[in-house]
Amino acid sequence: MKEISGIKVKVESGSKYTTDHGFHAVKDGIRNKKENAVHVRKPDWLKVQKQDSKEYLKVKSITKKHKLSTVCEEARCPNINECWSHGTATIMLMGSVCTRACKFCSVDTGNPKGWLDKDEPMNAAESVKLMGLEYVVLTSVDRDDLEDGGAGHYAATITAIKNLDENIKVEALTPDFAGINENIDKIINTKVDVIAQNIETVERLTHPVRDPRAGYWQTLNFLKYVKQKSPNVLTKTSIMVGLGETDEEIYKTMDDARSVGIDIITLGQYMQPTKHHLSVERFVTPQQFEEYRKVGLEKGFLEVASGPMVRSSYRADRVFKRNNLDL
């Protein structure tokens, strides 16, 4: 269900609809097409228990009141109940419609034509304060329709949060801003604590998995630039497994990430959000995820969060505090 002009309307996955702001978007990001593969039963270790706790309902109420989107909802994150029940959430800036169409992602796609909520930076900051967060992750849709890709909006939000309480740790999980250094500088020049950008998959699968405007080395060079300009800012990336990659390719991706100074890496199982998206090629066992973590730490990452249900921002506060990462 989508809420349009205050009315809940059923929009089928893959269908086109008109947003409240007057531009068109595609529900779940991928147009209707034949199923990619026969449905594969999920193993028992991927089953999630629902937890509608008081904290979960509190976070949901605050984000709705302040007209904020969360990647937890828009990307159908399997950890939404756990994270929200612990009073944490990942706020998605600049709306819920992305200008790109990655084949694994269920976020709606379209062209927002420059629309931005100018009140969002302060609304986000006030929400963080009301939730009582010590650590917040800010992420966003890609906004190629904006001159700076939305970097200035990100910076304004980080600054608003830090102005309310400079002790709140802020992680910015950003788009690539087309790899333009002047845009990246807008984020670096705030008091941000962690800058993350997801490489998503191994180099061989980048084109079939990600939007053509994204790039394997574009992501790595983005994070390399961040580390060179601001060595004290932690850098982070994330890989999904189960898209057809090999373990050897995963380890090579780890090597490439370490070669540009990335500090933290997360690995989790890809799960097909709708029948129109890429199918799951394999389910990786919890034991193999433990092996990924062991290898990653041996390669020099300060922290490796690896598990079937791990996502890039999963309990990011906890990951940040491990191994003396707290700033």
Curated annotation (Swiss-Prot):
Catalytic reactions on record: [[Fe-S] cluster scaffold protein carrying a second [4Fe-4S](2+) cluster] + N(6)-octanoyl-L-lysyl-[protein] + 2 oxidized [2Fe-2S]-[ferredoxin] + 2 S-adenosyl-L-methionine + 4 H(+) = [[Fe-S] cluster scaffold protein] + N(6)-[(R)-dihydrolipoyl]-L-lysyl-[protein] + 4 Fe(3+) + 2 hydrogen sulfide + 2 5'-deoxyadenosine + 2 L-methionine + 2 reduced [2Fe-2S]-[ferredoxin]
Pathway named in the protein's UniProt entry: Protein modification; protein lipoylation via endogenous pathway; protein N(6)-(lipoyl)lysine from octanoyl-[acyl-carrier-protein]: step 2/2
InterPro entries for the chain: Aldolase_TIM (IPR013785), Elp3/MiaA/NifB-like_rSAM (IPR006638), LIAS_N (IPR031691), Lipoyl_synth (IPR003698), rSAM (IPR007197)
Subcellular compartments: Cytoplasm
Ligand binding ([4Fe-4S] cluster 1): C72, C77, C83, S313
UniProt domain Radical SAM core: residue ranges: 83-302
Enzyme class, spelled out: transferase
Cofactor(s) named in the record: [4Fe-4S] cluster
Entry superkingdom: Bacteria
EC number per UniProt: 2.8.1.8
Main localization, broad class: cytoplasm
One GO term describing the cellular component: cytoplasm
Annotated residues for binding of [4Fe-4S] cluster 2: C98, C102, C105
Cofactor note: Binds 2 [4Fe-4S] clusters per subunit. One cluster is coordinated with 3 cysteines and an exchangeable S-adenosyl-L-methionine.
Pfam families: LIAS_N (PF16881), Radical_SAM (PF04055)
HAMAP family in the cross-refs: Lipoyl_synth
Database matches in PANTHER family: LIPOYL SYNTHASE (PTHR10949), LIPOYL SYNTHASE, MITOCHONDRIAL (PTHR10949:SF0)
Family stated for the protein in its record: Belongs to the radical SAM superfamily. Lipoyl synthase family.
Protein name: Lipoyl synthase
